[in-house]
Curated annotation (Swiss-Prot):
The chain crosses the membrane at residues 51-71, 78-98, 141-161, 190-210, 215-235, 257-277, 289-309, 342-362, 372-392, 397-417, 439-459. GO terms for cellular component: apical plasma membrane; endoplasmic reticulum; lysosomal membrane; lysosome. It is a multi-pass membrane protein. This is Proton-coupled amino acid transporter 1. PANTHER family: AMINO ACID TRANSPORTER, PROTON-COUPLED AMINO ACID TRANSPORTER 1. The gene is Slc36a1. Electrogenic proton/amino acid symporter with selectivity for small apolar L-amino acids, their D-enantiomers and selected amino acid derivatives such as 4-aminobutanoate/GABA. May be involved in the efflux from the lysosomal compartment of neutral amino acids resulting from proteolysis. May play a role in specifying sites for exocytosis in neurons. Belongs to the amino acid/polyamine transporter 2 family. It comes from Mus musculus. The keyword Disulfide bond applies. GO terms for molecular function: ABC-type taurine transporter transporter activity; amino acid:proton symporter activity; glycine transmembrane transporter activity; L-alanine transmembrane transporter activity; L-proline transmembrane transporter activity; proline:proton symporter activity. Residues 1-15 have a biased composition (Basic and acidic residues). Disulfide bonds join C179-C328. The keyword Oxidoreductase does not apply.
């Protein structure tokens, strides 16, 4: 792998919610050059169906499993409606990013711009001299939030793995073949969930040492298969014998709504996968249709799982719906199967942050120390995600915090501002400016309030939510 310093012309965009190595260069960032991007129809093209599948892959992750709790935090009526609104706004922001990237590509005569490049060159269109002179900070800001997002995903994976394995092991003696009823189980106490996280640490460190995306693509395939099968089994259970929902609140207390926002925007933060997929699509003129179709499917999936999961388990819903599944071998296997998928996905999410941070560090050391420094930095980064997960061992709070801090910036705040600065000098209607300002304000309010409420809940958990929101609690 090349260890040269990251440069604008070398940087390849891996800013997807779930990285898809199949369509990425095997040598990572160092081997990328603008000429390696071929407009669809040349070398590396994808059909509309392949693009749709990759779009679905890039938006479905652990955030999906936390949506039933998110609906609880918003209410049975307000939750699904809010998911629909956030989904529409998120898709609109994806469209803004694609439009601005196309405009700047034509203006600068470049074959492709990733998210960071688009923001950087967009700032160069600003009427402010100071902003133009500091446009390189646009890329740095995108990279910063991308790193926070991807390492935040890794923290979520640590908590998810620990909670699910802990539950399966503690309930092993009481596991039956009867999956008809979701009965209460008295678990056999084992070690603390934080010790489970430490148990996974050495294996995830070794997994992070894989630096070739072609090798990681094998793990990506295994992860996709295991998670797909698990989702089918989860849906199969939650649609059966739904209890009377009359006791569930249509609108939850306002104090928990920011937690809903963080989780929802965490789930919808797949904006980084949009530009690479559009660039590789054979008939790129059809990409907007594929984008809207794919995100419509994802929005329906999110709303249905969130609503049905909350209807099925009510106030007892956990930070991940897998923790509410019955204590029978079939659904215990589902927990393990999904956990296996998450385990392998860790390396793919970690790769994104590693390929931004490591080249800049390794380029400063002598060549014969490059490999050692590379591996040491990878080890340190994995350890950091483990420590953060140990410090915040509640899955719902980790998801909400990551969503509020970084996902809101990438998905809601930056794209509307980018549209304003990109088209400001060419004439932009006041209505568009107003619309973009409202979206950015929505994202910023969610950023501030969601982060504040997540931290408050972390420091001083509310009595009503401390047991139901914690993934450490048992069914």
């Amino acid at each position: 792998m090349s260890t040269q310093r990251l440069r604008n012309e070398d940087y390849h965009d891996y800013s997807s919610t779930d990285v898809s190595p199949e369509e990425s260069p095997s040598e990572g960032l160092g081997s990328f050059s603008p000429g390696s991007y071929q407009r669809l129809g040349e070398n590396s093209s994808m059909t509309w169906f392949q693009t749709l599948i990759h779009l679905l892959k890039g938006n479905i992750g652990t955030g999906l499993l936390g949506l039933p709790l998110a609906v609880k935090n918003a209410g049975l009526l307000l939750g699904p409606l809010s998911l629909l609104v956030i989904g529409i706004v998120a898709v609109h922001c994806m469209g803004i990013l694609v439009k601005c990237a196309h405009h700047l590509c034509r203006r600068l005569n470049k074959p492709f711009l990733d998210y960071g490049d688009t923001v950087m060159y967009g700032l160069e269109c600003s009427p402010s001299t100071w902003v133009r002179n500091h446009s390189h900070w646009g890329r740095r800001i995108v990279d910063f939030f991308l790193i926070v997002t991807q390492l935040g995903f890794c923290c979520v994976y640590f908590v998810f793995l620990a909670d699910n394995f802990k539950q399966v092991i503690e309930a092993a003696n009481g596991t039956t073949t009867n999956c008809n009823n979701n009965v209460t189980v008295i678990p056999t106490p084992t070690m603390d969930s934080r010790l489970y996280m430490l148990s996974f640490l050495p294996f995830l460190v070794l997994l992070s040492f894989i630096r070739n995306l072609r090798v990681l693509s094998i793990f990506s395939l295994l992860a996709n298969i295991s998670m797909f099968v698990s989702l089918i089994m989860i849906y199969q259970f939650i649609v059966q014998r739904i209890p009377d929902p009359s006791h569930l609140p249509l609108v939850a207390p306002w104090k928990t709504y920011p937690l809903f926002f963080g989780t929802a925007i965490f789930a919808f933060e797949g904006i980084g996968v949009v530009l690479p997929l559009e660039n590789k699509m054979k008939d790129s003129q059809k990409f907007p249709l594929i984008l809207y179709l794919g995100m419509a499917i994802i929005t329906v999936l999110y709303i249905s799982l969130g609503s049905l999961g909350y209807l099925q388990f009510g106030a007892n819903i956990k930070g991940s719906i897998t923790l509410n599944l019955p204590n029978c071998w079939l659904y215990q296997s589902v927990k393990l199967l999904y956990s296996i998928g998450i385990f392998f996905t860790y390396a793919l999410q970690f790769y994104v942050a590693a390929e931004i941070i490591i080249p800049a560090i390794v380029s400063r050391v002598p060549e014969h120390f490059e490999l050692m420094v590379d591996l040491c930095v990878r080890t340190a980064m994995v350890c950091v995600t483990c420590v953060l997960a140990i410090l915040i061992p509640r899955l719902d709070l980790v998801i909400s915090l990551v969503g509020s801090v970084s996902s809101s910036a990438l998905a809601l705040i930056i794209p509307p501002l980018l549209e304003v600065v990109t088209y400001y000098g060419e004439g932009i209607s006041p209505l568009t400016v107003t619309k973009d300002a409202l979206i950015s304000i929505l994202g910023f309010v969610g950023f501030v309030v969601g982060t504040y409420e997540s931290l408050c809940e972390l420091i001083q958990p509310s009595h009503s939510d401390s047991s139901t929101n914690s993934t450490s609690a048992f069914i």
